[in-house]
């Protein structure tokens, strides 16, 4: 699954201008509820080895990395702590909210846990309302397949 995601992301980032390549400076923000796979995606895209845990609160500060295998462009991925809404209750949620609202990411990738879509959609609607382009990425599809 990570290979397919990485390949898709690289294909999305390819731009062609009359046969010539455009240089890009792009900053992606990985947002979503706690424990939905943001850090796993960050590691797959950047080649990093950030700690991943199967419980909320593992990522407590934002982490930045460059997309691996792309030497021509400056493509930064920002792994944000998990949030349920843009109304923060914890310091980690403040970090995420402040980045999303004040640091002008070019695109927000909203990772949604496919096993519990309803819980994730409140944040999705708030992210769309920011006016920043949002890509909704359903994650954990393998768990849905196992359920039948």
PLM feature spans:
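Conserved donor sugar-nucleotide recognition element shared by glycan-biosynthetic enzymes
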Residues: 92
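Conserved C-terminal guanine-recognition region of P-loop GTPase G domains, centered on the G4
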Residues: 68-72, 95-148
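Conserved G1/Walker A P-loop phosphate-binding module
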Residues: 2-89, 103
């Amino acid at each position: 699954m990570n290979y397919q995601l990485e390949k898709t992301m690289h294909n999305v980032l390819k731009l062609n201008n009359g046969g010539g390549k455009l240089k890009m400076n792009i900053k992606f923000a990985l947002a979503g509820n706690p424990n939905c796979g943001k850090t796993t995606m960050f590691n797959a895209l950047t080649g990093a080895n950030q700690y991943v845990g199967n419980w909320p609160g593992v990522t407590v500060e934002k982490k930045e990395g460059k997309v691996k295998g792309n030497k021509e462009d400056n493509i930064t991925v920002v792994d944000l702590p998990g949030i349920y809404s843009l109304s923060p209750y914890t310091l980690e949620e403040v970090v995420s909210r402040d980045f999303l609202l004040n640091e002008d990411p070019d695109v927000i990738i909203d990772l949604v846990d496919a096993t519990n879509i309803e819980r994730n959609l409140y944040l999705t609607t708030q992210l769309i309302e920011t006016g920043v382009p949002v890509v909704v990425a359903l994650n954990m599809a393998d768990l849905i397949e196992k359920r039948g």
